[in-house]
Amino acid sequence: MQIRNILVICVGNICRSPMAEYFLKQNHPNIDIESAGISGMVGHSADDKAIKCMDSFNIDMRQHIAKKLNADHIKKADLILVMSQNQQKHLEQTWPFSKGKVFRLGHWQGKNVPDPYQHDQDFFNETCLNIQSYVSDWKSHI
């Protein structure tokens, strides 16, 4: 199956999922990639610390606006990347039709992506590097 639409999910859609979204867009410019939050902080911009991390990769996330996950996002996506096993279970229980297309971003390394929200810049930087690594792991599978 050819992947045309990728959805990246985290809790608030202001830290992890936008970072992954923007890294994926850089690697896959011809794929429709978006992000959303399970309990999205609707209308908020990306966290300043996340923006600072991404700036170091010359990726500008200042235009990101958080949105809340809904069934239409799930239906449209060919691949859904989440940050943890708990998020995967939540999606598959809430939207059973999502089974088979929901994977952890860190799937290939067997890792969850801890939430950096309200942590210091160093934690954000480490999270950003992990996300970049996990996104790279997906390159040969997309």
Task: Specify the residue positions occupied by each region the protein language model found.
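Phosphate-binding/catalytic loops
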Residues: 79, 85-142
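Hydrophobic beta-strand core positions in alpha/beta domains
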Residues: 8, 81-82
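Conserved active-site segments centered on acidic
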Residues: 1-75, 140-141
